[in-house]
């Protein structure tokens, strides 16, 4: 329960007004229920002509010292006067109408209590999803290198859905049932405190049975949600690798793997559901046992004519039965909540993940790039493995510096340090003499444009993708950017021109077309610093020519850091740096490095 209260403390404050209304309407519903069932006593007295009916000859003054006797006497007096005035039959009708009226008010209050909790339930779930999404977009790239996409998607969908179906669906029970239990229990104490105290002996025993099952349920739920993440990860990997799966005729192998994971998930869910289904029959059985015990003890009191009359005892039983239902629902919530808390733990792995790329407390705001980018004694490692070692490099404004080297030499990591996708462990990365860790992150990244090997586009129109991240761009500016990127002509050949949807990740376009749309996006942003990460790799000759032409236009008057796989694309760079095992081993122009006869020349000869 402590964990559950902590969850409510985190997410409930914005919805306090709905909570207050829910509590008020639940209290009203409980009071009306007590009063409506109290009408049963005079009805039973009239029907069965019980001893004591009509014995009250005058009203007793109100007093808290003997409140029970006052209420019993005065109610009997009014009923007696009513019988004398209109007769027993009409009195029964009037009491019945009173019962119907109070029941109508009670059901109205019940509806309002449920209606006011719905905005709270749906709002909290929305807030959790929003917090998750914002956290995902703010976390550094390093976090996602250690996490599977399918697992993250599972937490956004399956775990949030479990919180909604388990914890949020229990809010009504948890804010309604304790109020009903308190009011009904007070009524039971008022009717017969001796009989009520006797029934309390059995409550801890029943609660222990429920707790044993609930604790095991949470453990099983954590395992089930973890297996659901494995299932989603398998689906995500399959969708991303369908071409390879088909090329290697591995459909059967992947089907078997998925069936194995899916069957494990089914087994775990089955265990959770079976244990959860124990809630209703167990609470039903325990409630019946309690009623039987009270019937026996209370029946003895009635037969011996001690403390309770027959109609009052029946009213007591009605109230006891009324309290059993919220107790059963309360126990049901006790089974649901552990499942939800298991999902909250998994969600919190993202929400409470450390954001290592933090905004400086007093950021230096920079709106333009004036002089140079400098890597000063920069070293960087992933985990315990050093990827960059003592890098020293100065990139003057307006110059183009190319990075070459074999895969894993640290080229992409080096350029990722400029926009602070990662932070260095040793040394500094400076822009105009200011450490990038002192700059506002938004200001820093606004200075930089990226065109990568993987042309990442969104399921949107051409115009939506080109203007992504650029506010208030005019159509004229969009078209101009597309023309410079050699994209305008093929865009206009589509059905709706710039309003044509390009599909998931630009799937309706060729590789060269996707890359040119990315270049148009970078041109529209008009950044002073440009990072090109193997932007022409994996393209055919014609597409490469068009993309390279667009890149050369984009690079005009910009400071460019280019990672190149094909050395022919960087011959005109002002400086070429050759990286090997995390160090710059050679640097110079193309001609200088060829003349040097070292690592760069060997790479060049391999591609010739």
What spans do the regions from the language model cover?
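Helix-loop-helix
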Residues: 187-201, 275, 279-345, 350-351
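Hydrophobic alpha-helical transmembrane bundles that constitute the permease/transmembrane domains
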Residues: 27-35, 100-111, 163-166, 170-185, ...
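Juxtamembrane helix-loop junctions of ABC transporter transmembrane domains
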Residues: 33-41, 45, 52, 98-149, ...
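Transmembrane helices of ABC transporter permease
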Residues: 21-28, 172-222, 296-309, 325
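An intracellular "coupling" helix at the cytosolic face of ABC transporter transmembrane type-1 domains
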Residues: 13-17, 141-142, 158-167, 171, ...
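Hydrophobic/aromatic residues within transmembrane alpha-helices of membrane transport systems
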Residues: 44, 101, 132, 136, ...
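Membrane-integrated ABC transporters
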Residues: 1-40, 47-99, 105, 112-117, ...
């Amino acid at each position: 329960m402590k964990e559950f209260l902590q969850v409510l403390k985190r997410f409930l404050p914005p919805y306090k007004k709905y909570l207050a209304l829910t509590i008020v309407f639940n209290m009203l519903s409980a009071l009306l229920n007590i009063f409506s069932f109290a009408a049963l006593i005079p009805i039973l007295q009239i029907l069965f002509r019980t001893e004591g009916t009509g014995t009250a000859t005058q009203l007793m003054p109100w007093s808290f010292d003997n409140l029970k006797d006052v209420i019993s006497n005065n109610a009997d007096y009014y009923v007696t006067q009513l019988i004398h005035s209109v007769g027993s039959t009409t009195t029964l009708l009037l009491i019945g109408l009173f019962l119907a009226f109070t029941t109508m008010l009670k059901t109205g209050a019940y509806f309002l209590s449920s209606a006011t909790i719905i905005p709270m339930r749906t709002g909290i779930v929305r807030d959790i999803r929003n917090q998750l999404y914002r956290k995902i977009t703010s976390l550094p790239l390093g976090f996602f290198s250690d996490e599977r996409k399918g697992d993250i998607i599972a937490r956004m969908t399956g775990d949030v859905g479990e919180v909604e179906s388990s914890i949020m669906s229990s809010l009504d029970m948890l804010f309604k049932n304790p109020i009903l239990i308190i009011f009904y229990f007070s009524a039971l104490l008022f009717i017969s405190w001796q009989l009520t105290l006797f029934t309390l002996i059995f409550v801890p025993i029943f609660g222990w049975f429920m707790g044993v099952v609930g604790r095991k349920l949470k453990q099983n739920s954590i395992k089930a949600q973890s297996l659901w993440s494995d299932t989603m990860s398998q689906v995500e990997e399959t969708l991303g690798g369908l071409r390879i799966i088909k090329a290697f005729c591995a459909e059967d192998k992947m089907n078997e793997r998925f069936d194995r994971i899916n069957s494990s998930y089914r087994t775990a869910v089955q265990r959770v559901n079976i244990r959860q289904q124990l809630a209703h029959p167990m609470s039903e059985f325990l409630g019946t046992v309690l009623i039987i015990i009270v019937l026996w003890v209370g029946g003895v009191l009635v037969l011996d004519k001690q403390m309770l009359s027959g109609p009052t005892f029946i009213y007591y039983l009605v109230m006891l039965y009324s309290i059993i239902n919220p107790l059963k629902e309360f126990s049901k919530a006790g089974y649901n909540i552990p499942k939800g808390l298991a999902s909250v733990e998994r969600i919190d792995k993202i929400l409470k993940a450390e954001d290592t790329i933090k905004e400086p407390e007093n950021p230096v705001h920079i709106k333009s790039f004036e002089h140079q980018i400098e890597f000063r004694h920069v070293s960087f490692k992933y985990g315990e493995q050093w990827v960059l070692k003592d890098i020293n490099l100065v990139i003057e404004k307006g110059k183009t510096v190319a990075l070459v080297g074999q895969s894993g030499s640290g080229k992409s990591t080096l350029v990722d340090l400029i926009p602070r996708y990662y932070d260095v462990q040793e040394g500094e990365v400076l822009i105009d003499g200011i450490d990038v860790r002192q700059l506002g992150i938004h200001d820093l990244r606004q200075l930089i444009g990226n065109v990568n090997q993987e042309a990442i586009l969104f399921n949107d129109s051409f115009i939506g993708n080109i203007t992504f991240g650029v506010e208030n761009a005019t159509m004229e500016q969009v078209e101009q950017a597309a023309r410079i990127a050699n994209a305008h002509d093929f865009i206009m050949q589509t059905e709706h021109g710039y309003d044509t949807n390009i599909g998931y990740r630009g799937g309706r376009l060729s590789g060269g077309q996707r890359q040119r749309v990315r270049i148009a996006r970078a041109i529209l942003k008009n950044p002073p610093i440009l990072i090109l990460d193997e932007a022409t790799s994996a393209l055919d000759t014609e597409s490469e020519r068009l993309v390279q032409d667009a890149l050369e236009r984009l690079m005009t008057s910009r400071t460019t850091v280019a990672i190149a796989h094909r050395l022919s694309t960087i011959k005109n760079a002002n400086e070429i740096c050759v990286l090997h095992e995390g160090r710059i081993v050679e640097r110079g122009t193309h001609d200088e490095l060829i003349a040097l006869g070292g690592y760069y020349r060997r790479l060049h000869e391999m591609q010739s």
